[in-house]
Regions:
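Short beta->alpha connector loops
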Residues: 10-14, 58, 157
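Short, high-confidence coil segments that cap the C-terminus of an alpha-helix
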Residues: 73, 120-124, 186
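Conserved glycosyltransferase catalytic-site signature
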Residues: 60-65, 171-178
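Active-site-proximal specificity loops/subdomain of glycosyltransferases
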Residues: 33-79, 84-100
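Catalytic donor-sugar/metal-binding loop of nucleotide-sugar-dependent glycosyltransferases
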Residues: 180-187
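Short, well-formed alpha-helical segments that are part of the catalytic scaffolds
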Residues: 4-26, 38-45
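Conserved catalytic core of nucleotide-sugar-dependent glycosyltransferases
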Residues: 86-175
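A short acidic (Asp/Glu
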Residues: 16-19, 42-44, 87-90, 136-142, ...
Length: 187
């Protein structure tokens, strides 16, 4: 079972979009990671859900590394702080047009059950396709080995501890982490 949802956030103290879009039962699993200068205000609002990053961490790649190391003994998810959860479904008879709707509480249950099932089968990490990518009806609803917007879930106990989170151009760390894990035989 997914134990934690971690939301790294910056500059959204009073506008936690992802958190507001989660059902109440998932809000109980949420932790926010924040820069030290935002900690007190976030703590006043969200209490012990707020984790203060060390002073030396200023960018997202080191933040993601810190999150991975902090939660590496758990099954956890890492969400951006501005997510809206949308389902795209085929629109029969409309060619390439798709129907979009917001996640329901049941969609969240189904999504987490799907991820838990994948982890039980040995899949250790994965992500989501961005909503603006038009799905392929032949592969709907799941596309394997496609571009991910960001890493979304980790089965921490099954993953190596020597991932390098910031070894390339100072960006694209999610893609690089994916390649490191895939190159090491993880799926």
């Amino acid at each position: 079972m997914i134990q934690h949802i971690v939301i790294p956030t910056l500059g959204r103290t009073h506008n936690q979009i992802t958190y507001k879009n989660l059902p109440d039962n998932l809000k109980e699993k949420v932790y926010f990671t924040v820069q030290p200068h935002e900690y007190d205000e976030m703590n006043d609002i969200y209490g012990d859900k707020v984790l203060k990053l060390p002073e030396e961490i200023k960018r997202i790649a080191p933040t993601r590394e810190w999150i991975f190391n902090k939660f590496n003994d758990t099954r956890h998810m890492v969400f951006d702080d501005d997510l809206e959860f949308v389902v795209k479904e085929p629109n029969p008879g409309e060619g390439t047009k798709w129907l979009s709707r917001r996640f329901t509480d049941q969609d969240f249950v189904d999504a987490l059950d799907l991820v838990d099932g994948w982890m039980d089968e040995g899949i250790c990490f994965g992500g989501l396709l961005p909503a603006w990518v038009i799905p392929d009806v032949k592969q709907w609803p799941v596309r394997e080995n496609q571009r991910m917007m960001t890493n979304w879930f980790f089965n921490g106990p099954e993953l190596p501890r020597d991932i390098q989170w910031n070894r390339v151009m100072g960006g694209a760390e999610d893609f690089d982490v994916n390649l490191q894990l895939l190159s090491s035989g993880f799926k």
